[in-house]
A protein has these predicted regions:
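N-terminal first-folded block
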Residues: 2-32, 36, 40
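Short, well-ordered beta-strand segments in beta-rich or mixed alpha/beta enzyme
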Residues: 2-9, 39-66
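Non-catalytic surface loops within mature trypsin-like serine protease
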Residues: 10-12, 58, 92-94
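An amphipathic, aromatic/His-enriched active-site/gating alpha helix that lines ligand/cofactor pockets
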Residues: 24-36, 55-89
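Glycine-rich beta-strand-turn "strand-cap" elements at beta-sheet edges
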Residues: 41-46, 75-102
């Protein structure tokens, strides 16, 4: 399993168009083989910042996702050519358990 988290920053006046792109990439990503979870959320304290979280069954499934044409297009259009700030981190958890257990 691999977890990815991070953020992308945009100019506030671009956010409506960016949200449309985030909705589309989310829908398609959730359909990819090996996608356990995938979401975006507007940062409540930083205007124009969107945080993301992804969970994939394996590094291989994540790599396959990154090579999908829609993902390549998203990265080019909304990250490489539009984001004014960005960072992301990958985590490789060694175990998984419920955080709701007593």
């Amino acid at each position: 399993m691999i977890l990815i988290s991070g953020y992308l920053d945009y100019r506030p006046e671009e956010c409506d168009e960016v949200v449309a792109g985030l909705v589309e990439v989310s829908k398609r990503s959730l359909e990819d083989a090996g996608c356990v979870d995938y979401w975006w959320a507007a940062d409540l304290e930083t205007p124009g910042r969107f945080r993301f979280f992804e969970c994939w069954e394996s590094e291989e499934k994540f790599a396959a996702h990154r090579s999908q044409p829609y993902e390549v297009e998203f990265m080019e259009r909304y990250v490489n050519n539009r984001a004014i700030g960005a960072d992301a981190w990958a985590y490789d958890p060694s175990s998984r358990r419920s955080a709701m257990d007593d």
